[in-house]
């Protein structure tokens, strides 16, 4: 009785019977007034009831307060470091391709951001050496934290267009925003392309979220699809897709520990310069049910 207190109206979805809660004195039980309005319904075991407002007599005292017991979810920030080195000889060499130090800095930054992005997808929440003065922490990623998983292994890797539609309407858009982003692998993109040719008429929306997305409209919401380049490189992700509700995700970093370039990390007697990019960040996931993870989707029929 977290939400059903004395005065709450309950409806039996199977019979239409309306009941009013008259007492909520125990943690797991309710006393109700049956058959409001003069009906004469019976109630079966395991009948499904839902709350349909409340009704109180004139001059009544205030009802019992309802309870809200939120589930606590945690994650860690992870330290990412990408160093690069240029010898003093190379720095002093006039190269046709331009400044080597700048070139290596650009490449190192790309690798650094790729490391962070992959951790946001595939990282596993963990802490090692937790009792020491120098613990090592790993941030949990999307694929390891999302509990709304549609694994097609039990269906021989098959999900038809009708099954996909039902998953969107009944599961994926059941909670959260009416627009979500699907990052998918090449095989999943091929499945969706076949669906789109038959019915959906996909429309390209340019510049959204910094990438080009293809919009699929459904009765439940709009699915914005992007063939993720990382999923081409990561084994096992060609037949997978991660569906994200961005308002319920946050990139978190410690104060002063967002991505920065730290210069001159070389030893004092080293004939080279060494710099590194360093970030201490993690992923905050709110309302886990708003996201989804599809995997092992090999065929559509």
Where are these regions (language model features)?
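Flexible, glycine/threonine- and acidic-rich loop/arm segments that mediate assembly and lattice contacts
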Residues: 1-5, 14-218, 222, 228-301
């Amino acid at each position: 009785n977290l939400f059903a207190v004395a005065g709450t109206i309950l409806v039996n979805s199977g019979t239409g019977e309306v009941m009013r809660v008259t007492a909520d004195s125990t943690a797991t039980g309710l006393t109700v007034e049956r058959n409001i309005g003069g009906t004469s319904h019976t109630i079966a075991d395991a009948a499904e009831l839902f709350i349909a407002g409340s009704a109180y007599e004139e001059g009544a005292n205030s009802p019992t307060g309802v309870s809200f017991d939120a589930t606590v979810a945690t994650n860690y920030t992870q330290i990412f470091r990408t160093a690069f080195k240029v010898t003093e000889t190379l720095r002093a060499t006039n190269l046709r391709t331009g400044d080597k130090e700048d070139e290596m800095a650009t490449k190192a930054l790309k690798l650094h951001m790729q490391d962070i992005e992959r951790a946001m997808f595939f990282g596993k929440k963990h802490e090692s050496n937790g009792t020491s003065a120098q613990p090592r922490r790993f941030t949990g990623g999307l694929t390891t934290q999302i509990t709304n998983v549609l694994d097609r292994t039990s269906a021989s890797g098959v999900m038809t267009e009708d099954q996909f539609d039902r998953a969107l309407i009944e599961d994926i858009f059941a909670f959260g925003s009416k627009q979500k982003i699907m990052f998918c692998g090449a095989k999943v993109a091929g499945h969706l392309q076949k669906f789109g040719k038959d019915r959906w008429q996909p429309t390209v929306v340019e510049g959204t979220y910094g990438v080009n997305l293809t919009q699929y409209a459904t009765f439940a919401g709009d699915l914005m699809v992007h063939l993720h380049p990382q999923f081409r490189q990561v084994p096992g992700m060609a037949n997978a897709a991660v569906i994200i509700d961005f308002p319920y995700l946050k990139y978190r970093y410690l104060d002063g520990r967002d991505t920065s370039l730290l210069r001159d990390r070389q030893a004092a007697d080293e004939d080279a310069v060494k710099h590194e990019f360093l970030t201490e960040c993690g992923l905050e996931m709110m309302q886990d049910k708003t996201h989804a993870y599809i995997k092992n989707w090999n065929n559509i029929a």
